[in-house]
Curated annotation (Swiss-Prot):
Catalytic EC class: isomerase
EC number: 5.4.99.25
Name of the featured protein: tRNA pseudouridine synthase B
A Gene Ontology molecular function term of the record: tRNA pseudouridine(55) synthase activity
Protein family (similarity comment): Belongs to the pseudouridine synthase TruB family. Type 1 subfamily.
Active site location: 48 (nucleophile)
Annotated gene: truB
Catalytic activity reported: uridine(55) in tRNA = pseudouridine(55) in tRNA
Biological source species: Escherichia coli O139:H28 (strain E24377A / ETEC)
Source species, domain of life: Bacteria
Entry-linked NCBIfam families: TruB (TIGR00431)
Lineage per the UniProt record: Bacteria, Pseudomonadati, Pseudomonadota, Gammaproteobacteria, Enterobacterales
Amino acid sequence: MSRPRRRGRDINGVLLLDKSQGMSSNDALQKVKRIYNANRAGHTGALDPLATGMLPICLGEATKFSQYLLDSDKRYRVIARLGQRTDTSDADGQIVEERPVTFSAEQLAAALDTFRGDIEQIPSMYSALKYQGKKLYEYARQGIEVPREARPITVYELLFIRHEGNELELEIHCSKGTYIRTIIDDLGEKLGCGAHVIYLRRLAVSKYPVERMVTLEHLRELVEQAEQQDIPAAELLDPLLMPMDSPASDYPVVNLPLTSSVYFKNGNPVRTSGAPLEGLVRVTEGENGKFIGMGEIDDEGRVAPRRLVVEYPA
């Protein structure tokens, strides 16, 4: 007879983890899941092991809405090593080419300007995008290069921070799907010297407050503190979570009266006043505005359910 599967807590929310360098995003996710004893967990856009910074971890029902964070913009601080190109476009790869750094300040400014605004980017072979059902980095590790189509991205802001010796520091505010490693590699080619990432930190995701980020070390300290005080760790850990609907905070809210929300939660589209004419909406119910799921305005102007919160018994 197989063992019954161990079930974690029904804890719902988003932890803004400050990921440390050298750890994979999945390792970070599993550690947070264990600390919170959560029944489900997922992250919203991986960070390379070399990178640090904001990694939103969705727990419980929040995992249903993590996809909306994947569509959000992000901000990074990056330091590039000029004069060296690597196979992965970062310091974890092998140096494949070395060239002298000879560009002028004017040439640097002109090159940076070509990366601002709406541009197209060919993803790195060392990415998790798939080709014929297989991740690109799996091909790359076998020495195989496959065709990749250029994808549209937007660089809302590209700030020059400093250029000292063979180091170049930038801050980049960009749209979903932007590979900072690829920007640095492409920039190095424009400058004629090659470049790769030696430091990368994700400063922000969507509108999440930076001051709410916490490290794994801090979470462990809270668990120890709870043990010393003889209280459940959840009393110290759970207040760190952002609301479960925070991944969808950019979408308008439609509040349903309780008489309508019961139909919505049973999978039926409902009519209500004050709804937008089209698009996705966050749906709440009652006077307290309890979040019950995501809806979409259908062709008849009704709010149709798309993703619903499952209410577990206490």
